[in-house]
């Protein structure tokens, strides 16, 4: 009989992803009602989304879930203050190290899951990152590292103080207005920074006035700057330098009531939510129940937080052609075995297909890592499959369950791919948290390599950054940001979605279990695969239970992805190695026995005569005996490690 193709498995995963996203809306509302979201529902199209079987045409949806503008702001977290990084106990406040105040330790840093934040070892693991909402209605991650460098001079170096580098007022920080680079921050000079070096703010940089240049030409710039800084009382400020208030020219730090900010953050609610309507999302609603099929006209349903719903007719008039069985043109992918274990084993052993699907999803890994991923997936997936089988009221056959397992495996790989992006974002945050100890070293080397320092510069006069430095530094950080996110140096804007934070709302096991029902529905609705073969999945024997432990063991064994040829080659190499090792070490036992005898004689002589010489002989003979005892197994395992 025919089986699902790679195209069918991918389509099943897409269907399950969209339907799970629909149910995820209610879960998000229950867990994080104060983080507002937008979503769009439309009838799925076989041309644009996934193949829609005729039996699902009235239920198949394409769902997009995103943060609203207010929700994006609520998720944002900047984790740096003037002299370090925030912790779970750091209250919300502002820095005033330049003319612009910068908020830090927002509630999203540690209050998305407060219980998790208070666990031992989680003090430095922020739960979100810093985001901005673009004119294109996207919530994107920004480059907080450059913002930290501009706003917190103390974090620029590991060793304090380096005159003119970390004992200075900060740059003014503002988001880049260029819509092509919403992730970027720009640094700007200010009067307080220029005053630190005896200059004035002129045309966006620190310079002498024309008459000061004449005086400097006569006296020398260093002498003139020294007298000017002395007159402005800057040296006394440097003796008691305050990193939180680095200059009297700067405005006072804004006052902040952290408890009030936290309470306001938690109190946000979306008053436009239609709770009764959204309850349907967990009940597999039809297009008619959602109001998306008005007299045969398909509608797109868009929800905007704090505004409500809007309906627009969708652009396409048809939802894709229905597949027609073409047995004569179908590839030979048939399988006659109705045993569930055989179906699972056969699918896993066809590693070219499975590995190809993983590559299409976006995984770039060695076969060894892929095997490990398969084993981890199967350990959790098969128990969930049994729970689904017990919980469903649908008639399930052996072949239907086997094909659902295949789709679930592909769907699990898709979920891991999504979580990889989330992990990248969290990795950036973790790197930022360690900036004062790790990135700081890189930054100081970068700074020292790009600045021309005087041989003797006790006040850091020559460490003043040139006019172009903030823009150059910002571009450098932005390049590193893109390269960290994507090894292919992609410059596409990455939108961060609520599902990237799914681990706060639901566990992986729950998500996998719920998705199995959608996968079962999709596979059961398929009548013809992408090759044009009739599936007839309901014609095999019904299955009501299976041995979970046996199936897990079978899956783990099949996940090894060994062929018979590989096994025979392994056996041949192993036998050859054992024979070589035995021939090369025939005398090891005899020599070890002789040394053990000498060890016993030396020990007896030492006990009888109490002379140090006999003890030395005893120690030498004992070490030699031990060497010859372990020599053979050591050489064997060393060779095995090299070969295998």
Curated annotation (Swiss-Prot):
The keyword Secreted does not apply. InterPro entries: Baculo_p74, Baculo_p74_N. Keywords: Viral occlusion body, Virulence. It comes from the Viruses. GO terms for biological process: viral life cycle. GO terms for cellular component: viral occlusion body. Pfam families: Baculo_p74, Baculo_p74_N. Essential for virulence of baculovirus occlusion bodies for insect larvae. Belongs to the baculoviridae p74 family. This is Protein p74. It comes from Orgyia pseudotsugata multicapsid polyhedrosis virus.
